[in-house]
Curated annotation (Swiss-Prot):
A biological process from GO: positive regulation of RNA splicing
Keywords assigned by UniProt, alphabetized: Acetylation, Hydroxylation, Isopeptide bond, mRNA processing, mRNA splicing, Nucleus, Phosphoprotein, Repeat, Repressor, RNA-binding, Ubl conjugation
Assembly with partners or alone: Interacts with U2AF1L4. Heterodimer with U2AF1. Binds unphosphorylated SF1. Interacts with SCAF11 and SNW1. Interacts with ZRSR2/U2AF1-RS2. Interacts with RBM17. Interacts with PRPF19; the interaction is direct. Interacts with POLR2A (via the C-terminal domain); Interacts with PRPF19; the interaction is direct. Interacts with POLR2A (via the C-terminal domain); recruits PRPF19 and the Prp19 complex to the pre-mRNA. Interacts with KHDC4 (Isoform 2). Interacts with ZRSR2. Interacts with the SF3B complex composed of SF3B1, SF3B2, SF3B3, SF3B4, SF3B5, SF3B6 and PHF5A.
Region Required for interaction with PRPF19, annotated ranges: 2-93
Family annotation (Pfam families): RRM_1
Record-given protein name: Splicing factor U2AF 65 kDa subunit
GO molecular function terms noted in the UniProt entry: C2H2 zinc finger domain binding; enzyme binding; pre-mRNA 3'-splice site binding
NCBIfam families (alphabetical): U2AF_lg (TIGR01642)
InterPro entries membership: Nucleotide-bd_a/b_plait_sf, RBD_domain_sf, RRM_dom, U2AF_lg
Residue ranges annotated for the RRM domain, each copy included: 149-231, 259-337, 385-466
Reported function: Plays a role in pre-mRNA splicing and 3'-end processing. By recruiting PRPF19 and the PRP19C/Prp19 complex/NTC/Nineteen complex to the RNA polymerase II C-terminal domain (CTD), and thereby pre-mRNA, may couple transcription to splicing. Required for the export of mRNA out of the nucleus, even if the mRNA is encoded by an intron-less gene. Positively regulates pre-mRNA 3'-end processing by recruiting the CFIm complex to cleavage and polyadenylation signals.
Similarity remark: Belongs to the splicing factor SR family.
Organism: Mus musculus
Subcellular location(s) of the protein: Nucleus
Length: 475
């Protein structure tokens, strides 16, 4: 055998040997993988048995399943409690924290009107994948509702402090049962002493609205005027008027209704108290407003009112309409459109036959006595300003003009016009006092001078006590 044949035989043997080893390794690896699969299968079987056993133990220990259970892997398991919390609606049908006094529909209406940013309360995702809803701005200090939580208060007592004003309104709110939560409803007070008004800020919109019922309340002798601020914008779905009536408080705003009365033909020199005394002879008033000139502050000769007892409305119309006051005749009727045509058939016929005897200061007619008890001293008001009395020459001219005019009605005995003094509060400064020799002459002067104009100002008159006049007690 040649060397080449020997070499080729050797190669074939080596190849056969390698093929045998490869087949052996494949069979061994296949058996190993099969054993591994069997071991893993047995392990899974054991785990499944353990899980099923543990699940059965948990079901035996747990309470009976309620609604909310679900089927999984052929068995029943309880829904985790934290999943139930995720289902609670917080911001769509329930008012968020800070908006407890607003119904869900009102809250949605405010969102639609742009008064609450719709995106401000949208859930955001944390890096862990959890949904977190931002906390909404609470009502207290919220700029969203600040306009609706403020009230203008006019005609405040001179020199009143912010603390006293806050204490007064907080006390009145509690006494009237108008607070909605413990604590003080008034958060802040701002007073403008120069212009004699203040602004109140409340903690909630509803308490602000209810505080409107105190319009006309007396505070330290002053009838407060309560209004909404000029920048007030009504909130959607919320009432603008209070739902309560505070006994004894006569509001200065008379809302439109079938019971609102118009009183025309009033003498211009009558003030609020005089007209109210005329009207309250039929019953207590719920609201009253004497319309005045914004420039002079004097009456325009007509007013509006509403009675607490609506049943006396027609009686007041029957008793006051056509009444003669001085040189004027009253026109009293319902202010609402169409309501003034309401018939009075159901009223007793004796109403029109009964004269109304009233005691109204400043009036004089067959039914109304003027100025209380007449005296020989007449007080003239709204004629001069204190600064107009500083100049001696101008002062003497005023005295002379008053004397000349009053002498037309009778013999003038004396005239007193208190003048201002620097650093001293002078009693009666700005008023003019005229003493006649008889009460009769003084009455004639009052009739002739009341309602006249002096320096383009309407003259207002009243009687003065002679003893006080002689003591120079001009308060």
């Amino acid at each position: 055998m040649s060397d080449f044949d020997e070499f080729e035989r050797q190669l074939n043997e080596n190849k056969q040997e390698r093929d045998k080893e490869n087949r052996h390794r494949k069979r061994s690896h296949s058996r190993s993988r099969s054993r591994d699969r069997k071991r893993r299968s047995r392990s899974r079987d054991r785990r499944n048995r353990d899980q099923r056993s543990a699940s059965r133990d948990r079901r035996r220990r747990s309470k009976p399943l309620t609604r909310g259970a679900k089927e999984e892997h052929g068995g029943l398991i309880r829904s985790p409690r934290h999943e139930k919390k995720k289902k609670v609606r917080k911001y769509w049908d329930v008012p968020p924290p800070g908006f407890e006094h607003i119904t869900p529909m009102q809250y949605k209406a405010m969102q639609a009107a742009g008064q609450i940013p719709a995106t401000a309360l949208l859930p955001t995702m944390t890096p862990d994948g959890l949904a977190v809803t931002p906390t909404p701005v609470p009502v207290v200090g919220s700029q969203m509702t600040r306009q609706a939580r403020r009230l203008y208060v006019g005609n405040i007592p001179f020199g009143i402090t912010e603390e006293a004003m806050m204490d007064f309104f907080n006390a009145q709110m509690r006494l009237g049962g108008l607070t909605q939560a413990p604590g003080n409803p008034v958060l802040a007070v701002q007073i403008n002493q120069d212009k004699n008004f203040a602004f109140l800020e409340f903690r909630s919109v509803d308490e602000t609205t209810q505080a409107m019922a105190f319009d006309g309340i007396i505070f330290q002798g002053q009838s407060l005027k309560i209004r909404r601020p000029h920048d007030y914008q009504p909130l959607p779905g919320m009432s603008e008027n209070p739902s309560v009536y505070v006994p004894g408080v006569v509001s200065t705003v008379v809302p439109d209704s079938a019971h609102k009365l118009f009183i025309g033909g009033l003498p211009n020199y009558l003030n609020d108290d005089q007209v109210k005394e005329l009207l309250t002879s039929f019953g207590p008033l719920k609201a009253f407003n004497l319309v005045k000139d914004s420039a002079t502050g004097l009456s325009k000769g007509y007013a509006f009112c509403e009675y607490v007892d609506i049943n006396v409305t027609d009686q007041a119309i029957a008793g006051l309409n056509g009444m003669q006051l001085g040189d004027k005749k009253l026109l009293v009727q319902r202010a609402s459109v169409g309501a003034k045509n309401a018939t009075l058939v159901s009223l007793p016929s004796t109403i029109n036959q009964t004269p109304v005897t009233l005691q109204v200061p400043g009036l004089m007619s067959s039914q109304v006595q003027m100025g209380g008890h007449p005296t020989e001293v007449l007080c003239l008001m709204n004629m001069v300003l204190p600064e107009e009395l500083l100049d001696d020459e101008e002062y003497e001219e005023i005295v002379e003009d008053v004397r000349d005019e009053c002498s037309k009605y009778g013999l003038v005995k004396s005239i007193e016009i208190p003048r201002p003094v620097d650093g001293v509060e002078v009693p009666g400064c700005g008023k003019i006092f005229v003493e006649f020799t008889s009460v009769f002459d003084c009455q004639k002067a009052m009739q002739g001078l009341t309602g006249r104009k002096f320096a383009n100002r309407v003259v207002v008159t009243k009687y003065c006590d002679p003893d006080s006049y002689h003591r120079r007690d001009f308060w």
